[in-house]
Amino acid sequence: MDALAGRTVLVAEDEPLLQQEVAHTLAAYGARVVTADSLVGAFAASEQTLDHAVLDIHLSDGDVHPVAARLSRLGVPMTFLTSEHRCEGLTRTYRAARVLQKPALPHLLLAAVRGGRA
């Protein structure tokens, strides 16, 4: 269960239950999880060294794209969580990013954060 041991993962999600579920799943596989429920919090969290970021597209105080742009410039791999069905723009803008539909199945989330395929 140490598939993510030593990795620090940001989970930016404003739905408390979903944030808790994602954080718990990643922590169960050994990740150190940093959480944020707002754009302001996600920006603050992006100041530390991150190995991956799991980002809700729409946070309580705004769109996550400014944080995603910053993380992209820093070379941090990202996985977007969304309930939207049309996400072509995300994969065009952030070519290396993965997109998962909410709620993400644990094995798909793990594969995305590890960088592999489920």
Annotated model-derived regions:
Residues 10, 34, 79:
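Conserved beta-strand positions in the Rossmann-like core of class I SAM-dependent methyltransferases
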Residues 13:
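Conserved acidic carboxylate
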Residues 16-34:
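Two-component/phosphorelay signaling modules centered on CheY-like receiver
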Residues 35-52:
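Acidic, metal-coordinating helix/loop segments flanking the phosphotransfer/catalytic sites
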Residues 61-66:
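Acidic catalytic/metal-coordinating carboxylates
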